[in-house]
A protein has these predicted regions:
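Extracellular/periplasmic ligand-binding regions of membrane signal-transduction receptors
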Residues: 61-95, 116-128
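Solvent-exposed, extracytoplasmic
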Residues: 93-105, 193-229, 234
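Membrane-proximal, non-catalytic sensory/regulatory domains of signal-transducing membrane proteins
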Residues: 144-181, 216-219, 240-275
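Extreme N-terminal signal-anchor transmembrane helix of membrane signaling/transducer proteins, especially
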Residues: 1-43
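Extracytoplasmic/periplasmic ligand-binding sensor regions of membrane-associated signaling proteins
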Residues: 105-106, 119-195
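Membrane-proximal alpha-helical signal-transduction linkers
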Residues: 320-344
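Cytosolic-side ends of inner-membrane transmembrane helices, especially those
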Residues: 13, 26, 30-31, 299, ...
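Short, hydrophobic beta-strand elements of compact beta-sandwich sensory domains
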Residues: 175-178, 187-197, 258-297
Length: 353
């Protein structure tokens, strides 16, 4: 019974050692590989943010450039009256639309250019080319541009059918407003340059289409913290995504956060444009980032189970091989007499040399 107890102890010791080694390796493997995957994913998301920011900034700079060029063009100043004021009429349409198109360039830096006077008229050129009375829907932005005296005013994405011929579907635009000044730097009107959102956010849209379900979530917030991409979603969904902006307030460009939508752990990378003030937030769930680790762990678990089975067999054989000589020696000692120690005695118990 005692020999069995000794064998059991040895067997458990061997098995415990094997399990400790295998478990330590599994923990190290998980910690090391998951860390590498996390760092790699965050680096990739930072690269994505940089490319998104570069493309969007370029689109906004193009709108800005067209606006500035119109403001400083000598040809645009010829439409002013003798008092150097702007009074839009249909006679200006042909010349000014040609000017706007030429300043926009062959790349169509702006899809639509509008020039407003302070009498309630607008000259439109681009997708829509017309002179008409304004409807007052843009008075807020016109007034904001007047107050900033030449500085740009960026609108959030807005939906309109104003420039669609059939008026049966919506288009999303971003506009840049700037005051239009005469030769004496006095504001006499407002310039609006507009671009469709699908062009402004082209790089993000292309990335999402190419990667489908594997694509990271991309959110863009303006300097006020309002969500501007994705733009064509419901107000309820926008409100649900708003907490993401609060979670990004900090010094780190790489974050680990809990999703406001699902509560799951997510990895995020952010970038802020000094030109537009936009914050780009790219997010990937931890379960997606660590999916390769989980797959490898399943393979590792099968290998560990195999090694453990082999270890059990080897441990059993080793424990028996150690206990057998001890048991043998025990029987020899039991057959020896204390007073005959040192004398050779013949026994029936076979002794191997």
């Amino acid at each position: 019974m005692k020999s069995r107890s000794l064998q059991s102890k040895l067997f458990l010791a061997y098995i415990s050692l094997a399990c400790l080694i295998l478990f330590s390796f599994a923990v190290f493997f998980y910690a090391f590989v998951s860390r590498q995957l996390k760092d790699s994913q965050i680096s990739a998301m930072n690269t994505l943010n940089s490319s998104f920011q570069t493309q969007v900034d370029s689109a906004i700079r193009n709108l800005d450039a067209v606006s500035v060029n119109i403001n400083y063009s000598n040809q645009s100043k010829t439409i002013l009256d003798k008092s150097f004021n702007l009074s839009i009429s249909s006679d200006m349409l042909s010349d000014m639309s040609d000017l706007f198109i030429s300043l926009s360039g062959t790349e169509l830096k702006a899809d639509q250019v509008n020039l407003y006077d302070f009498s309630g008229y607008v000259l439109e050129a681009g997708i829509s080319t017309i002179v008409k009375k304004t409807d007052g829907s843009k008075d807020e932005w016109i007034e904001a541009a007047r107050e900033l005296e030449g500085k740009k005013v960026l609108t959030p994405p807005y939906c309109t059918r104003e420039y669609t011929k059939s008026a049966t579907y919506d288009q999303w635009f971003i506009s840049l407003y700037r005051s239009f000044n005469n030769q004496y730097k006095r504001s006499v009107g407002v310039i609006e340059t507009a671009k469709q959102c699908k062009s402004v956010f082209k790089s993000i849209i292309t990335y999402k289409k190419k990667n489908h379900e594997d694509a990271a979530s991309v959110y863009v917030f303006d300097s006020n913290g309002d969500l501007i991409y994705p733009y064509d979603i419901s107000q309820e969904y926008k409100a649900a995504l708003q907490p993401y902006f609060e979670l990004t307030k900090g010094d780190d460009s790489a974050l680990t956060l809990a999703s406001p939508l699902s509560g799951r752990t997510e990895y995020a990378a952010e970038a802020v444009s000094s030109y537009t003030g936009y914050t780009y937030l790219t997010i990937q769930p931890e379960s997606v980032v660590l999916a390769p680790v989980y797959n490898l762990l399943r393979i590792l678990a099968a290998i560990v189970a195999l090694f453990l089975t082999v270890s059990i067999f080897i441990s059993y054989r080793l424990s028996r091989s150690v206990v057998k000589p001890v048991k043998h020696l025990k029987h020899i000692i039991q057959r020896m007499e204390l007073d005959s120690l040192g004398q050779e005695k013949v026994t029936a118990y076979p002794v191997s040399v």
